[in-house]
Structure formats: structure tokens, C-alpha cells
A protein has these predicted regions:
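Secondary-structure transition/capping motifs at alpha-helix termini
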Residues: 138-145, 186-190, 221, 311-317
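Gly/Thr-rich phosphate-binding beta-strand-loop-beta motif of the actin/hexokinase/Hsp70
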Residues: 1-13, 159-193, 324
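Alpha-helix capping and helix-loop boundary segments enriched in small/acidic/polar residues
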Residues: 123, 127, 165-169, 197-205, ...
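Small-residue (GG/TT-enriched) beta-loop-alpha framework at ligand/catalytic clefts
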Residues: 137, 141-156, 168, 172-177, ...
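Short acidic-glycine loop/turn motifs at beta-strand connectors
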Residues: 5-10, 28-36, 184-188, 272-274
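Phosphate/ATP-binding catalytic cores across multiple sugar-kinase/actin-like superfamilies
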Residues: 96-111, 150-162, 292-322
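Phosphate-binding loop and its immediate beta->loop->alpha context
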Residues: 9-144, 148, 202-262, 282
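Helical "lid/coupling" subdomains associated with nucleotide-phosphate turnover
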Residues: 214-216, 252-325
Length: 325
């Protein structure tokens, strides 16, 4: 997630406390030895979850509390989540999303912010949009306007586009969802005339593929992990601990032909295998190997775009712009 404000007629991204342009949409509940509860949001929450998985492995304390919950994918549902570290019995997806919005709001400290424009996937239905509005109210915003993400992308692109009018295809491969949208631009007016997507296709899925097809098989070849195969939550803790390395290497391979990772160099403990040997992840992944692994995920996105074009009797050469988000 990210937040921006208008300054001198320009949209300016507000950096996080870690000087990053984006904030992980992650919420973590903790409780110290005194029983005091707190909520961490963003990179601190994300790092804490990785640390939990690693600590669980190193101490042999495995339980069902270790794992990720993709609460943003459940917006508008009646799902609730609970654990012993929460200050109240349970949280729903809107309340968790509100914690992320509160953190983003805190990044603007030079003015009082009461109104917000929140972008949502084009595939969001009414109940999901209502849930987003509710999250904004919980976060303290008095006014909230929702804007479809393809429209937001087109608005940003259109500011510098040489050819304004025509039909644009927005290819929005996000962290957790994929949206394809056809946008008609005429006399400066943007309108989405058809959308298609997958609420369970995004960067997180790519990380899972890297873990399941590359990192996990690598460790199985190096260590004796039979008990991890037999105990569901033991394996889940190790898989969760590998998601950090997977994401780090995937991002690195966007700019390089190969990427190295070493838990030993980072002083990370992944526990022991069934023979009592320390588990260390020492691996080099090439861009070619990564692309081979994640190709099926991108094929899903491409096929969604093909179906969208076919449904509207359009061919690729009839598009004036392709916008990659």
C-alpha cells in the first residue's frame, strides 16, 4: 500500500518511516512478558511474522498460530480472526485494513487529513466496496471516495501520454490480485467498459511458487526432512520462513541474471532436520530458473487478457496503449 498527497499540483508519494515508497499491508499482534498487547503494521509486522516462523523452528515450538492470513482478499466477507495477542476477541477484514490505513495516514504529518481517495480493484463488487468505505471510517477519515485502480493507472499514464484517445488495456499484476481492464479514452474522459481478473493471483503467489518449486525441493535434497512432511504445521512454519528469502530473491532477479541467498550470512536459524543437523539455506537462483517456475502464473494473467479482448471483439493491434501496473 502507499499514500500520496497533492503538492503544488503534483502527486507526491509519502515515504514510510523506513524511507520506502510502499508499506506492506501486514498487521501483527504481539504481547510481551508483562501481558501488554500492541499492534505492528507494515515492515515491522512482516518482519515479526518471519521471525516467529524462524523462532518456532529453532525452538521446536510449532503450532497452528504460525501462518499468514490474506485478510485483504476477504474484504466484504463475514470472516473474523482471533488469537491470544489481540486486545479484543476478534478482528474482521475491515478492521485489519483500517490498521493499515491508520499507518498510512500517520505518514502525512504536516496537515490534518480528513478526506481520502482509495483505489480498489476493478473486480470489487458492491459489498467489497462498502467494506473498504467502512475501513476508511474506522481509520478516522470523514470522507472517502473510491476510485477503480485501472482508472487511477490511466490517469497517471494519461498525464504524459502523447496519444490521448483510444482503447487502453490495463495489466495490473498486484501483490495479491490481478486485474485486466479495458478503458475507453475520449476527449479526456476515462471509462472502464469491461474488466476481468483473479483475486488470488499476484506477487504473493509468485513467492509461493518460488518456495514450493525451488527452495523447498532444494532443502529436501540437502537435509532429512521427513518429519516436516508428516507434521503439517511444522512444514508450514518452515514454508513461512522461506517466503522472505523467496520475495527478496524474486525482486533481486528483476535487476540481475542471478541472485544468492544465505541464511548463514544473515545469522538466521531455520531449526534442525531429523538428524539434528542445522538447516541452512544456501542457494543461487538464475533468472531463467525463476521464469520457468513462475511462467504458469503469468500465463494465467495473459489468458485472462486474451479472454477479455475476445469478449469485446478486439485484437491487440486495435489497442492504442498497454499499461503495465
Amino acid at each position: 500500500s502507499a499514500i500520496a498527497s497533492m503538492e503544488s499540483g503534483k502527486s507526491v508519494i509519502k515515504q514510510t518511516k523506513n524511507l520506502m515508497d510502499t508499506l506492506p499491508s501486514c498487521v501483527y499482534f504481539s504481547k510481551n512478558k508483562k501481558g501488554e498487547r500492541s499492534i505492528r503494521v507494515g515492515i515491522k509486522a512482516k518482519d515479526s511474522k518471519y521471525s516467529d516462523a524462524i523462532q518456532a523452528l529453532s525452538k521446536g515450538e510449532i503450532g497452528e498460530e504460525f501462518g499468514y492470513i490474506e485478510f485483504k482478499r476477504e474484504m466484504g466477507s463475514d470472516k473474523t480472526y482471533s488469537n491470544e495477542n489481540m486486545a479484543k476477541p476478534s478482528y474482521n477484514p475491515e478492521e485489519l485494513s483500517a490498521e493499515v490505513l491508520k499507518e498510512l495516514k500517520s505518514l502525512i504529518n504536516d496537515e490534518v487529513v480528513n478526506s481520502v481517495v482509495i483505489t480498489v480493484p476493478a473486480m470489487f463488487i458492491a459489498i467489497q466496496k462498502d467494506a473498504t468505505m467502512k475501513a476508511a471510517r474506522i481509520a478516522g477519515f470523514k470522507q472517502c471516495i473510491l476510485l477503480q485502480e485501472p482508472i487511477a493507472a490511466c490517469m497517471a499514464y494519461g498525464l504524459s501520454a502523447k496519444k490521448k484517445d483510444g482503447r487502453w488495456l490495463v495489466f495490473d499484476f498486484g501483490g495479491g490480485t490481478f486485474d485486466a481492464a479495458l478503458v475507453k479514452v475520449e476527449d479526456g474522459i476515462l471509462s472502464v467498459f469491461d474488466t476481468e481478473g483473479d483475486n488470488y493471483l499476484g506477487g504473493k503467489n509468485l513467492d509461493e511458487v518460488v518456495v514450493n518449486q525451488i527452495l523447498w525441493p532444494h532443502l529436501k535434497n540437502e537435509y532429512y526432512l521427513r518429519s516436516y512432511e508428516q507434521v503439517e504445521w511444522k512444514k508450514k512454519a518452515l514454508i513461512d520462513a522461506l517466503k522472505g528469502p523467496a520475495e527478496e530473491m524474486r525482486i533481486a532477479l528483476s535487476f540481475a541474471d542471478s541472485a544468492d541467498y544465505s541464511t548463514y550470512d544473515r545469522n538466521l536459524n531455520l531449526g534442525e532436520d531429523d538428524n539434528g543437523e542445522d538447516i541452512d539455506l544456501e542457494i543461487t537462483i538464475t533468472k531463467e530458473k525463476l521464469l520457468d517456475a513462475i511462467n504458469d502464473q503469468y500465463e494465467k494473467a495473459v489468458n485472462i487478457c486474451k479472454d477479455l479482448l475476445q469478449r469485446n471483439n478486439l485484437a491487440g493491434n486495435q489497442l492504442s496503449s498497454l499499461i503495465l501496473v
